[in-house]
């Protein structure tokens, strides 16, 4: 889908190249610079959910980097098998979070279409409400999966911080903070959608899981950060 918006950059060669590139590629194929350029535009995708997923992918990649700097070092021979397994898990989490960048954009499309449906007659109003409810559910599922995946990543980055190379421990701390931010950011995308849901029981269920993930993993990420700080200061 080509995103149509006006940012004052229409005559800019870089902007035109990005828009042409967008017709046949994924957001995760963009350069960092191009992704930020598109993110700063008026189009709703990529948005906060995709940005959160990307932040999470960067966060766990930092943990994976710590693992890469640990494997093969005699000092860490005793934990090498554990670190290798952690790196495999980190690769999987990274791939899933990058996929969620795309899925978040895809989930917004039916919601956007639902907002644009006519509501001139009782039948149209009823149909719009039905389609809107289904779209809101879909728009909650992706950020909830981002949260779940970031929670896995926080558990994993704790191991990188504890067992990984001490010269790179600060990178594990940075990764933990990014994953916490990604978790929190994804939760906001749940809350804004559940607020509009007619099925209050379903909305409460989504909110409950988001609240529980935040309660456990915001604290855990903070603990990792604080332990890293205590070791390097």
Where are these regions (language model features)?
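Amphipathic alpha-helical interface segments
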Residues: 104, 108-177, 181, 193
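Preference for long, well-ordered alpha-helical segments
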Residues: 153-156, 168-227
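Polytopic transmembrane helical bundles with strong interfacial aromatic enrichment
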Residues: 21-30, 145, 192-193
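Short, hydrophobic/aliphatic alpha-helical segments
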Residues: 27-46
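Conserved phosphate/anionic-ligand binding catalytic regions in large, soluble enzymes, centered on
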Residues: 41-64, 167-186
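A structural-propensity feature for long, helix-poor, extended segments
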Residues: 74-113, 213
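Short, Lys/Arg-enriched N-terminal segments with co-localized hydrophobic residues
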Residues: 3-18
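Transmembrane signal-anchor/signal-peptide helices with a preference for the extracytoplasmic
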Residues: 65-77
């Amino acid at each position: 889908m080509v995103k149509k918006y006006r940012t004052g950059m229409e005559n800019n060669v870089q902007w035109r190249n990005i828009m042409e590139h967008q017709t046949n590629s994924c957001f995760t194929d963009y350069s960092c610079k191009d992704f930020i350029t598109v993110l700063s535009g008026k189009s709703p995708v990529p948005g906060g959910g995709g940005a959160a997923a990307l932040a999470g992918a960067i966060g766990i990649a930092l943990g994976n980097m710590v693992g890469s700097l640990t494997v093969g070092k005699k000092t860490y021979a005793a934990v090498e098998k554990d670190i290798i397994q952690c790196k495999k898990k980190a690769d999987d989490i990274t791939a899933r979070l990058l996929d969620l960048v795309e899925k978040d954009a895809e989930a917004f499309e039916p919601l956007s279409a639902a907002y644009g449906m006519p509501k001139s007659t009782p039948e149209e109003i009823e149909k719009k409400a039905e389609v809107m409810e289904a779209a809101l559910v879909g728009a909650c599922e992706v950020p909830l999966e981002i949260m779940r995946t970031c929670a896995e990543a926080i558990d994993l980055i704790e191991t990188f911080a504890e067992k990984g190379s001490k010269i790179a421990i600060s990178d594990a701390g940075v990764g933990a903070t990014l994953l916490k931010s990604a978790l929190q950011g994804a939760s906001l995308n749940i809350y804004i959608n559940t607020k509009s849901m007619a099925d209050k029981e379903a909305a409460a269920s989504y909110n409950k899981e988001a609240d529980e993930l935040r309660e456990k993993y915001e604290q855990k990420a903070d603990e990792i950060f604080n332990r890293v700080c205590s070791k390097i200061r």
